[in-house]
From Swiss-Prot:
<keyword id="KW-0964">Secreted</keyword>
<protein>
    <recommendedName>
        <fullName>U-actitoxin-Aer2a</fullName>
    </recommendedName>
</protein>
<dbReference type="GO" id="GO:0090729">
    <property type="term" value="F:toxin activity"/>
</dbReference>
<dbReference type="GO" id="GO:0042151">
    <property type="term" value="C:nematocyst"/>
</dbReference>
<keyword id="KW-0166">Nematocyst</keyword>
<dbReference type="GO" id="GO:0005576">
    <property type="term" value="C:extracellular region"/>
</dbReference>
<keyword id="KW-1015">Disulfide bond</keyword>
<keyword id="KW-0800">Toxin</keyword>
Length: 59
């Protein structure tokens, strides 16, 4: 499922904080995060068919 992201002081400019269960990552703010089936897979920042790894929040 898609995980909504929101702006946060814990992420650098241009990235939003995405919270998926125990996983918190910063994704580019034009993407959403998904952690695979049931949310237990590897989390990626998605946009259409393209994905990248999220970065670790600073706080």
């Amino acid at each position: 499922g898609e995980i909504e992201c929101s702006s946060s002081e814990c992420c650098p400019s241009g990235k939003h904080l995405c919270k998926g269960g125990f996983v918190h990552y910063c994704c580019p703010n034009d993407r959403y995060m998904s952690c695979g089936i049931l949310g237990f897979g590897t989390c990626y920042c998605w946009k259409a068919d393209y994905y990248e790894y999220g970065s670790t929040p600073t706080c």
